[in-house]
Amino acid sequence: MSNSLKAMRVARGTSQSLCIALLLLTCCTLSAQNEHARVRNIVLVHGAWADGSGWKGVYDILVKDGFNVSIVQEPETSFQEDVAATKRVLALQDGQCILVGHSYGGAVITEAGTDPSVAGLVYIAAHMPDAGENEADDGKRFPSDLSQSTAIKKTADGFTYLDPAQFREYFAADLSAEQASFMARSQVLNLADNFKAAITAPAWRTKPSWMLVATKDRAINPDLERWYAERAKSHKVEVSGASHAVYVSRPKEVAALIEEAASHAR
């Protein structure tokens, strides 16, 4: 074989190696850019008659997948204080975040989500009122089984709770009796007036939103959740057979939607 032919083959091999190396470098760069573009911080907001511990399954998945996760513990003593508690946690974030709310927490994130640190909102079987609206009135559009039951009780000083004997039926039908009983006995009483608090500036009007519909929700009518999503032009997913406690019973589906929001919100 002539020296010139050998040189051509060496040059061709070198060229191919360089092309492969450049292709790999480009792929790695794009992957790094996409990873960098993904929102890394997640803030979770629980709903009425619950506390932040219900997010444990979702928290574990998100942390394993590399997210920084914070959980708000609302006092439920007033809507304003719940919004303030949420904004307090938002102020601790080191960058953009996805703000997630369950149930009554949806109203809280709608009000608190105008914070500049919030890149997107995720509603998990949650209320999504507009300006001047409150969740109590919105609930009348599509009444829930819970709203027509005797399960909601009120204390002498105006705080509501769910009758522990009926908690599983209306809130957590897809959880074990033991887990539902613990949640019923550890529920945080919620000021009744919170459900009538009007939204001033709904964050979903200016930021991207996602809605998870729990198809067997008896606390919020699934049709109301669908209506909210359609009005807000939210990205919507439905979890078949899930109760209102979908964030506890179906953490994989909930975490997947949050991660989708983190990948697409800007």
Give, region by region, the residue ranges found by the protein language model.
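Flexible "cap/lid" loop of the alpha/beta hydrolase fold
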Residues: 117-118, 122-164, 191-194
